Each structure stands twice: as C-alpha cells, then as structure tokens.
Amino acid sequence: MFGLPRPVWLLGWVSLATDAATEAIYPLLPFFLTRVLGATALSLGIVEGAAEAVNSVIKIGSGSLADRSPSKRGLVLLGYSVSSIALPFIAITTSWPQVFTVRVLDRVGKGVRGAPRDAMLAVWTTPTTRGKVYGFHRGMDHLGAVIGPAIASAFLYFYPDHYRTLFALTIIPGAIAVALILLVPEPAPAPTSVESAVSRPVGPESADAGLRRRSSVDRQPSKGGLPREFTAFMLVLSLFTLGNSTDAFLLLKLTDVAGSTRWIPMMWSALHVVKATVSVVGGSWSDRIGRRAVIAIGWLVYAAVYVGFALSDSLPALLTWFLVYGFYFGFAEGTEKALVADLAPAERRGFAFGIYNAVQGLGALAASVVFGLIWKSYSAAAAFGLGGALALAATALLCVFVRPARLQLRDGTP
C-alpha cells in the first residue's frame, strides 16, 4: 500500500500501538506530577529531561550494537518489551521520584529500540523514497498519539479522576506492539561502504554549480568513521536541541491558563492529527526540494510557537499556537532522520542514528532543566522566549553550514 514494503507497514503499526499507550499518559503527567503528587515545574523538567538523557545514552550503545548485531529485530523487540512492562507502573506511584524511575525505565526501552529500528527502516528504502518512509513512520507515531489521548479523554469522561486505572490499562496496546514485532522479518546485512557509497546529490539542489563533484576534503570521514557533513549537521542540531525542552511545559501552561485538565488530552490528540498529516507531506517534500529546506521550515515554526507562548496568556491564542506546533514536528522530525540516513554510510547507519538520538536526548536534559529553572526563577515567558531565540539561531546556522552541496546520498540498496 502506498508503495511501501510490508515490514515498513508492520513497524508503523508497532509504533502506533506503542504511542497510543505512551500518549494516553503523557498529556496528564504535568497535572499528575504538579497537582496530585505536588511536584514543581523544576521537578517536571528534571523528570522529563533526565528520562530523555538516559534514553540518549542508551541509544549511543544500541546504535553501535545495531551495526554489529546479527539481529536488529532482537534489539527492537527488547526495547519495546521493556517500555510496555514499565509504563503501567505509573499507576502505583505516590511521589515524583517514583514517576522519575518509571519514566527512566520507559526511556531505556525507547533507547534500546530506536537506532536499530531506524536502521531497519533504512534497509527497506531507496534514495527517492527515504523521506517518504521516515515521514510515514512518524505519521504512524502521531496517529497512535491521536488515538491514545482520545481514548484517555473518553475514559476520564465516564470515570472522572481515575487516572491510575487509566495508566494501568496501557499494558494492553503495549502487548499488541510486542506481538506485531514478531511478524517483522530480520533485514539482510547491508553492503560495505566501498560497495554502496555513491555521490549522487539530492533533488533539485543538484542544479547548483558546485554539486558536480565533492572535494577530497569533503570525502574524508570524521571521527567515528562518519562524514564531516554529518558532524556539521549534528553540531547545528545540538544548538537547536538546547532550546527544545520537554513538551510537558507547553501542556503545563495550557493547563494553568485553562484551569482544568478536561480538554488537555483532546488538545494533545488534535496536535497529533496535525503531526500525522504534515509528517507525510513533509517527508515527500524533502525528497523533492531537499532536506535542509524542509528542516529549516520546521525549525522556524518551532521558534514562532515558542515566541507565541511567551507573549500570549489568552487561551484561544495558546490553543492556536499549540496546533501550529504540529507543523514543526511534521516538517522536521522525519526529515532530520532522512538526512541522517543520507549522510551516513550504510554499515554505520545504526551508529549514526545513535549519535543523532543522543544529541536529541542530551539536549532535552539541558533544555528542560534550564527551562524549569527559568520558569521558577523568572517567568514562563522568559523560558519560552529563550527557546524561540535558540531555534532562530540554529536555523540560521543550518542554512550557512549545512550547504546543499554537502547533502550526498550514501545508500546500501539498489
């Protein structure tokens, strides 16, 4: 269907089921932590930031292991199993450090599965469909994130304040995800970079005069056997992630302004409707007009949303900005992964995705803790303003240092 291989579809359904479980809980966590368990905004930042940092450390090892392991599917199965077992334990927590422990275990599972799963997806792509495949996968993630909060809202409508029961029931979609992984075939080993590396430019950017051949300096790998183009992108991405704090702060401000959690899960669901729609479009655009342009659009949207949250205290305005936020995810997330796959040799893609995920996670730790401190010490407006400014700076550097001439495909598929 849609020209995508069956394993891509199966992994998409796995992500849908897992996200349905995770996102049924996530939009309620800021309220649960701050109102039920008595945590502060700083504690919220520590919980979410540290969880993502642990996730990132695990992803470095899992990416390298995925390159060496004869069974990427085994790592994916292990990761999804850990998360599916850990997440429902939020139902019995009585303090924020306990939630912290559960969230860390959940993110350990995500860290184990992320890089090998992304490397598996790369096997079933071609240079012209890579953006579409990763965009589709993100779209299925977002679709699961639509279904989960919608079910949570319906459940809480009939059973008000039964948060713990809802959390416990997330074991059901988690079990479905684990069962589906068993149907995914183990991908064949990728060819070596000598056999697979090619120097074909991406899309219309090949029209630039400087794209005919790469210099001998550009051909040289950086540390870890990865090209310098990849390193440049990771450095720019690092700056962006320093302003990319946990989405829990957006939900916390919405909850504070709304004065209730009644509509928060539905708004989270609506956000993912936007994400799921735009991610497929963004992936296809990146195959046609180039990765850099689509990523830049997404980062600019992010900057606008954070500035909007800094300047607005009106609920209708915040709800509008919150929905616009979905365009950032739709344009940037899948396209960033497609660019990583473009720049990394086939036999190093697992490690490359591990580095990419590590940059994201470590940045989330720093961003979330700093955001929480600024919120507590100064104001929410100052914290959101800083995030927007860093996103603008990163976008400018992306356009300057990640040049079109550097976006070369390295593919291990015919």
Regions found by a protein language model. Give the residues of each.
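Transmembrane alpha-helix termini and helix-breaking/packing motifs in multi-pass membrane transporters
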Residues: 31-36, 147-167, 366-382
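Cytoplasmic helix-loop-helix junction between adjacent transmembrane helices
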Residues: 102-143, 339
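Symmetry-related core transmembrane helices of the 12-TM Major Facilitator Superfamily/SLC fold
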Residues: 164-182, 382-400
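Helix-to-loop junctions at the C-terminal end of transmembrane segments
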Residues: 58-71, 156, 278-290, 375
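Helix-loop junctions at membrane interfaces in 12-TM secondary transporters
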Residues: 91-103, 310-321
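Helix-loop junctions on the cytosolic side of multi-pass membrane transporters
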Residues: 173, 181-194, 399-411
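Helix-loop boundary and gating motifs at the non-cytosolic
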Residues: 2-55, 230-267
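Structural signature of the two symmetry-related core transmembrane helices
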Residues: 74-88, 171, 293-308, 388
